[in-house]
Each structure stands twice: as C-alpha cells, then as structure tokens.
C-alpha cells in the first residue's frame, strides 16, 4: 500500500531527472531490495514455522550467510551456508525465458520501480507450472513417505510411481518445461551433495 505523499514525492524527484540518469535511482533501489531479501525471507520462514522473534543480520556475514544466520538453523560445519550460496547463485541466473524472469523484465522495461518488477516476478513464480511446482514436488515426496511409513524400497516406489503415471497423473518435480536434458542446477546440487 503506497502512501499518496510518497507517490507524489517520488514523481517530483523523477520529473527532475533526465531519462539517461534513471539508472542511478534504479541501481539504488535494486541494491536496497537485494540487501533486504535475506531478512525478509528469513522473517517469513521464522513466522511461518513459529521459530520465534526475528534475528538481526550479522554485518560480518555474506548475503547467503546472513540468510542462514537469520533463519536460525544450526550450521556448525558451514555446509548449509555453502548450500545456500550455491542455491542462491544458481537461481539468480535467469535469462528471461521463464515466467518469473520474463514478468520481471517486462515490468522493468516500462521503467517501473524495481520493487514492482520483482513483485511481478514473484507473482509469476507462485504459479503451479513454475515455482509452485517445487512445493508440489515436496508434497509428493512427503506423501510417499507417509504412505509407506518411511522411505519405501525401490520396488514399492517403482510400482507406486508407475501406478500414478498410468492413472494419468504426473510425478511432480521431474522433467523441465523447457530443458530436454538434465537441468544443470540439478547436476550442481548432486555434485555438492556427493562432496
């Protein structure tokens, strides 16, 4: 919800700015937004899972390290921090071919505020054929675990999956809407896990 006086104030500032200088305000907004994301994400996690009060950032930690710190999960060996560095880097690299990146780029191309651009991308990410697919995959894995009372053996899992496919349902999280080969992000996560 935008306060009218701020909207008018922002417009007054932008009117005195040459179009060739818009990048300065955009850069400033972008840096501010990126700086706030770890605290925002960690705060949502802590609120959603009743983990207590907000944890303040640590100025001695990097972007991923602060996210891990503010979530509040133990990370004595630093593996969670390294995993989050990898995860965030791999998911920040989107050229514009998917829904969230395309929506963000489209809104930004109208010289909209970076906050609106990121919001557009997040709204696209919420769809079942994009980011929500990750949640559907996790639900599927947890439902398999519940059905079998733990991790099923290979044969039971194979029968369960074939039964699901033969009934016309999909197995969430497998395959990619665009790629026709292994997702390189998946390969990077497997390599990290094996180390």
PLM region spans:
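Active-site-adjacent structural elements in folded domains
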Residues: 69-75, 85-90, 100-111, 119-125, ...
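Single conserved hydrophobic/aromatic residue that forms the stacking wall/gate
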Residues: 1-14
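Cytochrome P450
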Residues: 142-148
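Conserved phosphate/anionic-ligand binding catalytic regions in large, soluble enzymes, centered on
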Residues: 36, 97-99, 109-141, 170-184
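Amphipathic alpha-helical interaction surfaces
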Residues: 40-43, 93, 124, 128, ...
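A structural-propensity feature for long, helix-poor, extended segments
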Residues: 148-193
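Glycine-rich, mobile lid/loop segments that gate access to catalytic sites or pores
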Residues: 15-95, 105-106
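Flexible, glycine/charged-enriched surface loops at secondary-structure junctions
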Residues: 48-54, 79-81, 95-102, 132-135, ...
């Amino acid at each position: 919800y935008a306060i009218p006086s701020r909207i008018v104030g922002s417009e007054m500032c932008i009117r005195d700015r040459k179009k060739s200088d818009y990048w300065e305000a955009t850069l400033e907004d972008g840096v501010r937004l990126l700086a706030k994301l770890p605290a925002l994400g960690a705060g949502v996690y802590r609120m959603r899972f009743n983990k207590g009060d907000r944890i303040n950032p640590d100025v001695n930690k990097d972007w991923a390290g602060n996210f891990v710190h503010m979530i509040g999960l133990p990370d004595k060996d630093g593996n969670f921090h390294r995993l989050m560095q990898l995860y965030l880097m791999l998911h920040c690299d989107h050229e514009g071919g998917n829904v969230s990146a395309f929506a963000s780029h489209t809104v930004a191309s109208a010289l909209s505020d970076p906050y609106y651009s990121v919001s557009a991308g997040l709204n696209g990410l919420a769809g079942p054929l994009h980011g929500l697919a990750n949640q559907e995959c996790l639900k599927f894995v947890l439902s398999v675990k519940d059905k079998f009372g733990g991790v099923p053996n290979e044969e039971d899992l194979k029968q369960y999956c074939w039964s699901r496919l033969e009934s016309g349902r999909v197995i969430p999280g497998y395959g990619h809407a665009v790629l026709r080969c292994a997702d390189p992000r998946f390969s990077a996560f497997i390599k990290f896990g094996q180390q």
